[in-house]
Each structure stands twice: as structure tokens, then as C-alpha cells.
Amino acid sequence: MKKYFEKKFWKYIYRRSLNNWYKRNFSSPSPEFVKHEIIKKNNLDNSLWIETGTYYGDTTNLLSNISSKVISIEADKRLYDLALKKFKNSKNIQIINNKSQNTLDEILKNNHNHKNLCIYLDAHLCMDHLTKE
């Protein structure tokens, strides 16, 4: 019975998100589950993912489940600290507190041991905090 209601709940959330996105003429940002499906569909084997903008770590968590390593860059100190706590037991996640334009070159130079490299540019101005990325 619980699974039935969970499924109904998520269908409602997805439908509502898609309707809102449609009303905005499919302008950015797309619903989170749409982004996640695109990421899963385009993932490469044995990949290193670099994510700019950790925020609350939902995409970071997804990436850690489908890749060999995730490096997530978060400029906001509060969100960085939250991510460190959230992922303290994750062996394949590295969180960096910096702006992506200040650290991306260094990350690319120091990570050549992965077969594939994928970059998810997700740093942007969020509604509830201000970080100029």
C-alpha cells in the first residue's frame, strides 16, 4: 500500500513539474528529474564527472552512483559545508569550495587517470542564496 501511494505522489510531482515547465515554454531550469535522466542516458563508462554547483547534492549523489569519481565545485561556503557532511562517507566524491572558473583548469590538469571525463555545468544563481559564479 505504501509503494502505491509513493508512486502516486511521484507521478503527481513529475506531472506538476512538467506542467510548470511547459507553461514557461520549456525555458530553464528544467525539472530536476529531466536533468537526471539526461545525465544517466549520456553517462560514459569509468567516467570522472566534474560538477559545477553542488547546491544540496542531489545531482552529486546521482553522479556518484553511475561514475567512478565525482568532483563537485561549490562556491557558497554554507552549501559546501552541508555537502561535506552529506558525503563524508562517500569514497568517490570530492567537494571543493571555490568558484569553478578559479579551479577547473587545475582539476583538469590533475585528473588524467580516467577513461572518460564529463563536465556538468550547473553553477547558476539559485533562488534562496546568492553566489556569483
Could you describe each region identified by the protein language model?
Residues 1-119, 124-133:
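A short alpha-helical cap/connector motif
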